[in-house]
Every structure is written in structure tokens, then in C-alpha cells.
Amino acid sequence: MRSGVIAQKVGMTRVYNDAGEHVPVTVLRLDNCQVLAQRTVDKHGYTAVQLGAGQAKVKNTSKAMRGNFAAANVEPKAKLVEFRVSEDNLMDVGSELKAGHFEAGQLVDVTGTTIGKGFAGAMKRHNFGGLRATHGVSVSHRSHGSTGSNQDPGKVWKGKRMAGHMGQTRVTTQNLEVVSTDEDRGLILVKGAVPGSKGSWIIVRDAVKSAAK
């Protein structure tokens, strides 16, 4: 098991493959993704690497974090993520991960925070059909209707799909294909859509279920 990378979502575009077919892709950019620390079994009880990406202003960095960055001999980072790895995949502190970490054709799992939509009704949030247009229905055409409660159990069950805050949740999209990489510009082109807004931080890992596909 090897480390993933921290990337920044640039946006979507399309490219043409060798067969002349256009493929919708999301462009992810690696911005100084470096190893900040190691976690070892002897010292921490597990093996992992801590990565940092982007650039943070020194004035916005705590004194403790400035010490960590200085120990790793790297500039302050805007985003930090820890990846569990096998012992033979530990990397030296300060080493940089580039777009060549992945290769065209392989499958990856991409994690990001979805775009927030604010307070949304049941029709938009859960794709409910709504109530009837007429025949006794007034004002509440787009409501979710009954919540299914009676004297017994006398409550609304947890997880009941209702109106509420939509988006702004952590989502992982699995088995996306890497169309191509550009190591000089630090770009990874992934087939399809990726959760998150432009400029948001994205975590890219080797797909865990690729063998099943």
C-alpha cells in the first residue's frame, strides 16, 4: 500500500483519445506536494507518511507548525494529510511527489468536499416526486409528505430523508481512470467529475476496488 497525493482541482475540460473520441476530464494540479513526516511502528505503532501541499503564509501558521515545517526543511504548507502506507513504501522527509506518481490508464479513488447548496427541500436533496398538483393538495406541493410516525413508535426514525443542508460533505468517488499526466506542469487528468469546487483540495489514491472491476 503506497501513499496518495494532495492535489488542487483546477476545473473540467475535455481531451481526445487515440480513437478520436472526446473524453470529459477533471484537471488536478499538484502544488509542491512534499513529505513532512514519517510514522513508524517502533515510535507510533503504525506506518504512514504525512504530506503537505500548497503554500501558507507564515503569519497564518502556528508556532508549533512552524517548528514542524522547519524540522522537515520545507516551506509552510496550506494543506496537510496523512496516508497509511506499508513499511516498504515509506518516503524520505522532504521528498516531493509529482504527477508521475500515477500513470495513464490506472484507476484511482478521489476524495473531496462537495459544493455546498445550502438548505434544500426533499425534492432537490433526495429526488422526491413531491405531492399531487391538485385533488386536495394546496401550498405543500413540494413537501416530503408524511414522516411515517404514529403513536407507536411515536418518533421520527434517525436517517429519515427530509429537507436540510445539502452538500458540503466529504465524498469519495471510486475507480476513476487516469487519462494522462503532465509531470512538467504537475497535472493529472482524471476521467469524469470529481467532488468539490474549483480550487478545493482533493486527495487522490490508488483504487482499492480496482481488482474487482
UniProtKB/Swiss-Prot annotation:
The modification N5-methylglutamine is found at residue 151. One of its GO terms (biological process) is translation. GO terms for molecular function: rRNA binding; structural constituent of ribosome. Keywords: Methylation, Ribonucleoprotein, Ribosomal protein, RNA-binding, rRNA-binding. One of its GO terms (cellular component) is cytosolic large ribosomal subunit. One of the primary rRNA binding proteins, it binds directly near the 3'-end of the 23S rRNA, where it nucleates assembly of the 50S subunit. Part of the 50S ribosomal subunit. Forms a cluster with proteins L14 and L19. This is Large ribosomal subunit protein uL3. It comes from Allorhizobium ampelinum (strain ATCC BAA-846 / DSM 112012 / S4) (Agrobacterium vitis (strain S4)). The lineage of its organism: Bacteria, Pseudomonadati, Pseudomonadota, Alphaproteobacteria, Hyphomicrobiales. The gene is rplC.
